[in-house]
Amino acid sequence: MPPVPRQTPVGSSRRFAHLSLRLLLLLIGMFTAALGVALTTVADLGTTPISTVPYVFTVLTGYSFGTTTFFVNIFLVAGQVLLLRRRFSLWNLLQIPTVLIFGICIDLAMAIVSPHAPAGWWTGLLMSISGNFVLAFGIVMQIRSKTIVQPGEGFVLAAAAVTRKSFGSIKIVNDVTLSLIAAGIGFVCAGELIGVREGTVLSAVLVGLFAKLIVKFVDRLGVFVQAGAAAIQEPQPPQPHESAITAIQTSEETNDQLTDERSSVQNRQ
């Protein structure tokens, strides 16, 4: 049996630096996403579908938006455990401290944005659209960090894996369900809709659209960067520290990755 190669100090420091950069990208992405949520919420046209339930509890109980976001997401982590059972990895429990940080980011973002509430419907619409773009940008950064998914996305991924449906289809069902739950709680407890309005529908459409546009731009930018790097050195295989810390992949996503890899190989040839 060949001897196992020892990890050199240079290799260890490189792995640590790479992981640190990914975690930094995750943190920046979380605050950016929180800022997007704050913008759409303060616009007063309805918050994002994933934030409707926490926002209703914030209005009804007086707890901060970040606090209710944390507790609602704890239930989403529990939902992943129920859906995946033995397939649930303990690594996915890292979503709990991650969403705690995200909740703090939301409270900070709300404190920054709240004093700048729009005066009319049109300015509110502009703020809502801007918030959706900022939110999409934050989501893309979190995904590109290849670290830890938020419980909201983790729950959808788990449901997609169990039902063998596409992520997009389950995401739509999840958003509609959360919005209906928030609307029901608002009607029962306050006799009116709370946080669910035209802006909620707008967010359901625009966030995904903006995210696709941002990804295309980033990918095109990456092509130029990779082309320059390829001219200097041969492409290297992915390193272990470049893999995701937590990941629940559906069969569709796996096939997409294989297709991307084949296309990359063909382009190099």
Question: Across the structure, where does each feature detected by a protein language model lie?
Answer:
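Core subunits and conserved enzymes of cellular information-processing
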Residues: 1-252, 256, 260
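Short, charged juxtamembrane terminal tails flanking transmembrane helices
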Residues: 265-269
